[in-house]
């Protein structure tokens, strides 16, 4: 066992050879490396599988012994300062390593097929492997300096993957938005690290916790300054985990490929903020007010994320706001001091959300058959519907993830979310009411996504939902370029090559470039109905994409058992996290009162079923061929006057669809102010700074010209200069001014 911990330092570096070899290969042998690009998926998956096996071994040992191991290498620069680097193995590290590796492997297997026809295949796998390396380095770090280094590397990888299709303006803007927003949090994190180093003189977690605890108990540190430093540390987690008010980058990050959305939302970037707060929780507990602040930010994010997801039409943006809300639950649990329930929900949510995002990728992949490679259309739930008949395996897996996130037993998220909801009553009744209400909203918007996607009829063939079929086709490449081409509707077989692809629903022409996926075999199959109209339909994804859905579906079914006690013994998660922090349950019993548990659980399940019922009532098409796409459609009156209720619903829809106008507020206030400041700075630089510099140059020129004539060797110039000086002297002597 000791040897296992001694060699744990290699965990972050095992996936690193893949991006290094890809970079060297592209530099020295670019043609051969590109021709053999598909082979790089195997070493990426293999190396991450080795880390997963190692992490499983560590986790088993942690469950059996609950030991904490830390190894440190010290580099002494002088007698007063030394740099220490090392790694820390504890229950939190083993849990995060398991999440990163298991979800990462599933995403890599999925991506091999999803990204097979993309020209950036090599760049994608290099970035993904380096992403795994950075995240594994973050969770094994033993001090704040290492945390910050890997924190920045995780951010860098996420920016590279969010802006993966950088020729698309929306993707480039999303990358910049994520970068700028996270700069705010990262700057606060850096200031907080420096502040605590100034207080304690150490970056090591153990030393930091012990010294700060002693200082606070003896009242040797300014509490206001300590609270400020803790709030700055928390700012980094707020930005990384998309908590209010630094959440605005998360929905725009959906411009990246769907597999990276799954990895970011399940086990890497947004989980990094939760990990940081969990790692520093012993520090936050001893500082006044900071725990209340964490729970306050968490509950706001819970409610805001759920309400913003209500009216989204983009399937990935809806799931993104769902992630934001669920991360708010985790942050709320950490702020309440319920360490176990926060990590439990982190585990269950990771597998459920990875399943949902990979399922959405399969849906998008199938919709691209019809609408082309246009994210505005392939991700638009308005154009979907009736996919249950065409992608049954994807539908079943997506339904599992949806029910899990809704909190339906016995799926994973039911067990973890129910713990957080019950703990919220012990912490604050107001927070509990908001948390329980949001549980109903979660069930509503998740089933709304499911119903709009899989139930009813395929709506892409109809324009404005009135039954009018579009006749022209258009295409748009994966890189944002497109080409218009009219195609005979009676063709039974359509094929796509490098420069042509086809789609329904738009009359807008696009010009096609060369960056289009190559696909072998028929592109569209046109089915003739009785009215002799031509249609095409989605198809199920390949087995390589369905296998990760199967594995994640099984995990979603059974991972909740980690937190269920059997035979009056401690559950696996409690053994795993022993000793852990739990401020709400100071006297934790080994046994559980199942009667009390099911009594509390029945209320949360009832709320979830109520949300599902409302969503089914509003969005499931029963009598009409088309579902009601907007929340207000059932309440719109034909008369000239609209009731107050209609106006409220319309305002709620607009508020949700427009992201609560927070982005608009930032644009008008912060962006406008920064632009105005930049213009003032530009004017000052050009007119004042450059004016002084240019003025000195012009003055030097004229002075030089004057000296040149004085000392030019001409007697007349000397006499003129001499007589002028004498005249000025005499005038000053005989006609004094004062």
UniProtKB/Swiss-Prot annotation:
Location within or outside the cell: Plastid, Chloroplast thylakoid membrane
GO CC annotations, alphabetized: chloroplast thylakoid membrane
Pfam families the UniProt entry points to: Proton_antipo_C, Proton_antipo_M, Proton_antipo_N
Enzymatic class: translocase
GO biological process: ATP synthesis coupled electron transport; electron transport coupled proton transport
Membrane in keyword set: yes
Known role: NDH shuttles electrons from NAD(P)H:plastoquinone, via FMN and iron-sulfur (Fe-S) centers, to quinones in the photosynthetic chain and possibly in a chloroplast respiratory chain. The immediate electron acceptor for the enzyme in this species is believed to be plastoquinone. Couples the redox reaction to proton translocation, and thus conserves the redox energy in a proton gradient.
Similarity comment: Belongs to the complex I subunit 5 family.
Subunit structure: NDH is composed of at least 16 different subunits, 5 of which are encoded in the nucleus.
Name this protein carries in UniProt: NAD(P)H-quinone oxidoreductase subunit 5, chloroplastic
